[in-house]
Amino acid sequence: MKNETIQYRTAPTPIVAKAPEQRQAQGGQMVLTGYAAVFNEPTSLGRFNEVITPEAFEAANMEDVRFLIDHTGVPLGRTSAGTMELTTDARGLRYRVTLPETARARELYEAVRRGDISQSSFAFRIGREDWEQVEGRLTRFVRSISVVLDASAVTFPAYEQTTVEALPFG
C-alpha cells in the first residue's frame, strides 16, 4: 500500500547576500545553494528516529519541485521553470536556486546571509520505508521517495545537518 502522506523535512543552510544596488552594479543574481536532505544521519521525529538512505532519491520524481520559505507561500524558484536545480551526491539532496528580484526573496537572502535562517528542509511522499530497532529506538529508514514536492529554507529543521549558503554576486 502506497503512503500518500506528505512528509516535511528541514535542515540548516548558511547564505551570503549583498544589497540590491551592489548586485545590479555587478550584474549578479541572488543564488542560494544547500542540502535539503542528508544521507545516513539519524534525526529524532518524536516517537521515532528517521534516516534517509542514499538510494532514496534514485527513482524520485523531481520534475516540478518548488523552493519555499518554511514550506509555505509563493515559490521563489521551481525546477519546472528552470530556476532551481536538484542533484544528489554522496552527502545528500543538493539544491541551487536563483531567486527572483522580489522583496520576499531579498528578505530571505539577507536573513540567510546574516545567519538568521541557516537550515533547510524538504517535503516528499514516501515510496518505500523499513522500520527497525536501532540502539533501543524505533527507526524509520526511508528507502525510496516517490516525489519531492519542495525544498525550503526553514526556521526549525528536522535535520540539523542540512545546509544553505548564499553564493557571492558577480
Regions found by a protein language model. Name each.
Residues V38, G77, R140-V142:
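A sequence-level detector of short linear motifs
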Residues N40, V74, E101-T102:
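Short, surface-exposed beta-strand-loop junctions and turns on beta-sheet-rich folds
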Residues F39, T72, F156:
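Residues that form or immediately flank small-molecule/cofactor binding pockets and catalytic motifs
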Residues M1-N61:
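Polar/acidic, low-complexity leader/linker segments enriched in S/T/G and N/D
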Residues Q7-I15, R23, V31-T33, R66, ...:
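Residue microenvironments linked to proteolytic maturation
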Residues P42-L45, G77-R78, Y159-T163:
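Short helix/loop capping segments that flank catalytic or ligand/cofactor-binding pockets
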